[in-house]
Curated annotation (Swiss-Prot):
The chain crosses the membrane at residues 4-24. It is found in: Cell membrane. The keyword Transcription does not apply. Pfam families: UPF0154. Signal peptide: none annotated. This is UPF0154 protein llmg_1186. Keywords: Cell membrane, Membrane, Transmembrane, Transmembrane helix. It comes from the Bacteria. InterPro entries: UPF0154. It is a single-pass membrane protein.
Length: 79
């Protein structure tokens, strides 16, 4: 009986560790992406330049704010 209980406890601990590790890594990844978005100012300038526009600094910052706001809103909608 003690052996079955020990094995069951090990399995439960392994599953709990797996799910907690997954949750923690997902949370850290989201935080990292919110702090350092993969789309930076240079990428926005390049994208707008490829569309035939010469963006001003105000336009670049506006696009970045819109992207960050959309990401934050989608993150809060998922919760």
């Amino acid at each position: 009986m003690n052996l079955i209980l020990a094995i069951l406890l090990m399995v439960v601990c392994l599953l709990a560790g797996f799910f907690l590790g997954t949750w923690f890594s997902q949370r850290q990844t989201k935080k990292l992406l919110m702090d350092n978005p993969p789309l930076n100012e240079d990428a926005v300038r390049l994208m707008m330049g490829s569309m035939g526009r010469k963006p001003s600094e105000v336009q670049v910052q506006q696009v970045l704010r819109q992207i960050r706001a959309a990401a934050k809103q989608s993150d809060t909608n998922k919760k």
